[in-house]
Amino acid sequence: MDSVATDSKAFTSADFDSAGIAAAVDALAKQHSGREDMFRAAVVQFLKAELVKARAAAQAQLLQDRHGRHCAERLCVVQDEIIRILYAAATEHLYRSDVPSGAERMAVVATGGYGRGLMAPESDIDLLFILPYKQTAWGEQVAEAILYSLWDMGLKVGHATRSVDESIRQARGDMTIRTAILETRYLAGDKPLYDELVQRFDTEVVQGTAAEFVAAKLAEREERHRRGGQSRYLVEPNVKDGKGGLRDLHTLFWIAKYVYRVRETAELVERGVFDAHEYRTFRRCSDFLWSVRCNLHFVSGRPEERLSFDLQREIAVRLGYTSHPGMQDVERFMKHYFLVAKQVGNLTAILCAKLEDQQAKAAPVLSRMISRLTTGSTWRRVPESDDFIVDNNRINLAAPDVFKHDPVNLIRIFRLAQKNNLAFHPDAMRAVTRSLNMINAELRENPEANRLFMEILTSNDAETVLRRMNETGVLGHFISAFGRIVSMMQFNMYHHYTVDEHLIRCIGFLQEIERGGHDEFVLASDLMRKIRPEHRAVIYITVLLHDVAKGRPEDHSVAGAKIARRLCPRLGFNNADTELVAWLIEEHLTMSTVAQSRDLSDRRTIEKFAAVVQSVEQMKLLTILTTADIRGVGPGVWNGWKAQLLRTLYYETEPVLTGGFSEVNRAKRITAAQAEFRNAFTDWPEDELNTYIGRHYPAYWLKVELPRKIRHARFVRSSEDAGHKLAINVGFDPARGVTELTIFAMDHPWLLSIIAGACASAGANIVDAQIYTTTDGRALDTIAISREYERDEDEGRRATRIGETIEQVLEGKLRLPDAVARRTTRGKQHKAFSVEPEVSINNQWSELYTVIEVSGLDRPGLLYELTTAISKLNLNIASAHVATFGERARDVFYVTDLLGAQINAPTRQAAIKSALLHLLASEDAAAQPAA
């Protein structure tokens, strides 16, 4: 980040003996005198070997001291010395000019990231060859000699050759070039030429253009975050370009360097931008991120910037993290990563706010570009408090000791900012952070502080204010249990965000549910209006706390309920509401599990769920909580199908809880669904429409969302008009990253297994399945498979291959196990995870069927293996409920024996369980042809 002084004397000769290597190159020049090509080849071979040794030494030192910046500096020093040696070889041996003309001068300069004096193992090298005037034959030869040597060494080099005049002219018009020159560093050649560039760049480009530069850099940052995902808490972060990553630190320093004309971050303390603590934080963040990035490059052997699941554990081990009860080593490492990302965000906010504050009077244009706030030159008291003022539309302290004389102000400042729609002054945020030690047991028990917190939680824009409280540390100190999950990631592919970010996002979605008007939340929004007024606060605190016990040895739902029982009385809840919050947290996964993995047309399923929820009011609250929770997991997780399943479960259960009464009884819901369907097909003849409606069982009308019903009807009609015995319709769901295959065929006892096997043979991983049978014996199944190709056309061709495989198997032309064995492989992401296999068998969830629930590590071909194994166990599959949660597959099968009876014999149940557990534990089962 600083313009590091890359002094090779700072490193031992064992790292890179520059003098000895230079002498060896001189010796090679003598050995190959007059044979330029041989000299070049010998130099490249020699320097490449030295570079390999130096990199190995840097990696060994990194593993020993885990100091990322030092590693990046070592690598940069080595690269600097290689370029200096190549420059000397070119100018002293290859193209020596004993009496150089004025034009035969050149400065070799490092730019961009390399110019900062820090270099990751697989980073590009950016060079600028500065000339006094236009290019000469000598200059071209020297530059080419250096570049070709670097390329022959296998290095990635970006380069430009310009005169000083050209550099200044282009820097004025191109922000990328301007930023690159901002971070130039002299390497070799004519030093006065480089000094001229630096001096002219400062006077002719930088002066008077701070507003333009800052606006451009902040716009670049916003666009980069938009492309990569706005949250800094995405669980596979990009270390370089992600939010809270190295590029954010770079942007921060570029802006500071440009505006304050500093060359080292330490100078920002002298300028009053950072205090000493913030500067130390800057250095710690930089070193940690460089440690991660250097290890990423060393482990992957390429310029890998994404901290993907398959690399996270190895990086954690290299950095010395160990497992603790309730938290794996990789989860502890990633928690540290996200804490650092949070600190980077805080530093960026401090710099931007400080720039605005210092420029508000002198440069209001810059102020507006940075803050996008309307500024003013006066301050006023904040309504309702003499302890705070409004300073340029930002809340600030009226006196330095406002937190000391009343610690409740540490909560009050956030509530006042929320009520008055104010941003936060950087001095206020600093004061808050420095006063966190005042949030003690006495403040946590203070009734006024807890009242203010509940107002924040249940008022407009709670998500934004809670996130600011979290970023300053107040939320985790005031709600101690929340502090334990700050920046905690869960090492799985299901959750997209850290636990604290997930909970805060869930609050945002809860507020969207309450506002209404969203088609995806129709049921939850309706229920939110109908819950008892006193339960509004109950649902808000439940949503905030439902995952607060993650990372503990005990089941997080049970542990979370215990936390709620301790915390809620302090927040002003009575005993009944405290118990309600605890119950909701303990059962917060129940509704989702039942809706997605049980047969909702089975009476026993509904009765057992009703016994759990106990009352309509509790079911309303659980439905709202479940909706917000699933929606907050990440993009594409919530969809119309899951919404419809929750809706079906809710309305199927309501009459059981009310003794037969339901706001919309079952028959009316079926009739309403059919009427809604009819309205979409006014162009169909009445007889045809009636016949089609009669082909579907009641469960279809209750469980399938309208857009899918419409697609089904058009697909079935066109397939039958074309006379197809088997038809496949392909759809794409970009939000979920899946391709949907809808298969229409004659029903067959092995059809699901055949479909699953055909998908496996094409390398397609099934993530969920919706399986329906019509009254006239046709199967209408929708299978969602993980997307493999970027283009829809390629995905469509893969779907066609799957259809052809199904048809060939049904016609007896293809032996499916052989086709599966040829293709099945597991993706590298799944290899990073370990999921304990689980199989449960019970007869309590259904009166007619035995329910087999299987859970284990997902892999291509797993559903095929399971359905094949179940059939070989002489079981009939009546229905299947297929779902994946990241790397975990959870499949539920409703089965009978060959006579149509439940499996009651304990010995037979044990044999089934043993066979399926063995299958789940075997990594290569899918690749083995069946006998």
From Swiss-Prot:
Disulphide bonds in the chain: none
Every ACT domain range: 740-822, 851-931
Cofactor list: Mg(2+)
Pfam families (UniProt xref): ACT (PF01842), GlnD_UR_UTase (PF08335), HD (PF01966), NTP_transf_2 (PF01909)
InterPro entries: ACT-like_dom_sf, ACT_dom, HD/PDEase_dom, HD_domain, NT_sf, PII_UdlTrfase/GS_AdlTrfase, Polymerase_NTP_transf_dom, UTase/UR
UniProt region (Uridylyltransferase), positions on chain: 1-383
Key words, A-Z: Hydrolase, Magnesium, Multifunctional enzyme, Nitrogen fixation, Nucleotidyltransferase, Repeat, Transferase
Region (Uridylyl-removing) location: 384-739
SUPFAM superfamilies for this protein: ACT-like, Nucleotidyltransferase, Nucleotidyltransferase substrate binding subunit/domain, Poly A polymerase C-terminal region-like
SMART domains documented for this protein: HDc (SM00471)
Record's catalysed reaction(s): [protein-PII]-L-tyrosine + UTP = [protein-PII]-uridylyl-L-tyrosine + diphosphate; [protein-PII]-uridylyl-L-tyrosine + H2O = [protein-PII]-L-tyrosine + UMP + H(+)
Entry keyword annotation includes rRNA processing: no
GO biological process, one term: nitrogen fixation
Regulation: Uridylyltransferase (UTase) activity is inhibited by glutamine, while glutamine activates uridylyl-removing (UR) activity.
EC number(s) from the headed UniProt entry: 2.7.7.59, 3.1.4.-
Sample GO molecular function, one term: phosphoric diester hydrolase activity
Highest taxon above the source species: Bacteria
Keyword Methyltransferase found: no
Location of the HD domain: 499-622
Main function: Modifies, by uridylylation and deuridylylation, the PII regulatory proteins (GlnB and homologs), in response to the nitrogen status of the cell that GlnD senses through the glutamine level. Under low glutamine levels, catalyzes the conversion of the PII proteins and UTP to PII-UMP and PPi, while under higher glutamine levels, GlnD hydrolyzes PII-UMP to PII and UMP (deuridylylation). Thus, controls uridylylation state and activity of the PII proteins, and plays an important role in the regulation of nitrogen fixation and metabolism.
Assigned protein family: Belongs to the GlnD family.
Record remark on domains: Has four distinct domains: an N-terminal nucleotidyltransferase (NT) domain responsible for UTase activity, a central HD domain that encodes UR activity, and two C-terminal ACT domains that seem to have a role in glutamine sensing.
HAMAP family: PII_uridylyl_transf
Protein known as: Bifunctional uridylyltransferase/uridylyl-removing enzyme
Organism: Bradyrhizobium sp. (strain ORS 278)
Top-level taxonomy: Bacteria, Pseudomonadati, Pseudomonadota, Alphaproteobacteria, Hyphomicrobiales
